[in-house]
Swiss-Prot record:
Pathway per the UniProt entry: Amine and polyamine biosynthesis; agmatine biosynthesis; agmatine from L-arginine: step 1/1
Site positions (Cleavage (non-hydrolytic)): 69-70
Protein name as catalogued: Arginine decarboxylase proenzyme
Record GO terms (molecular function): arginine decarboxylase activity
Lineage: Archaea, Thermoproteota, Thermoprotei, Desulfurococcales, Desulfurococcaceae
Superkingdom: Archaea
Family stated for the protein in its record: Belongs to the prokaryotic AdoMetDC family. Type 1 subfamily.
């Protein structure tokens, strides 16, 4: 196997937001804008945005932003004043913590939980050889 010196940088910030105001948690257009701005604040390149409102009394909003460096997602449960978020970015130039800070400043939860996982790979990556 041939060795190659590469660094694959992956940073994953995810968690829950409690006490999100209902008027924010139900506004699909507003939430789309928030997640796009969060992606941009992280230094990520927005590629595609999709969102939808789940109808009904227990409906909510989901927003997915596909970035060239990975993705951001936000899902709300307005009946519980609750939302979850997932911010995964690749590359040294991105900072998912900046996206998280923007979510906090925009959605203004009363409290939150946040987790971080370093999903980077070791510097030495073994390249697969073709089968014979």
């Amino acid at each position: 196997m041939e060795r190659r010196e590469d660094v694959i940088v992956g940073k994953h910030v995810y968690g829950s937001l409690y006490g999100v105001p209902r008027e924010k948690a139900t506004d699909e257009e507003y939430l789309r804008g928030v997640v796009v701005r969060a992606a941009e604040s992280a230094g990520a390149t927005v590629h595609a945005v999709n969102s939808w409102t789940i109808p009904g009394e227990k409906g909510g909003v989901s927003v997915i932003v596909l970035v060239l460096e990975s993705h951001l997602a936000l899902h709300t449960w307005p009946e519980y004043d609750y939302a979850t978020f997932d911010i995964y970015t690749c590359g040294e130039h991105t900072d998912p913590w900046k996206a998280f800070e923007l979510l906090l400043s925009e959605l203004k939860p009363r409290k939150y939980t946040v987790h971080y996982v370093d999903r980077s790979q070791e510097k030495t990556v073994l390249e697969a050889q073709p089968r014979r």
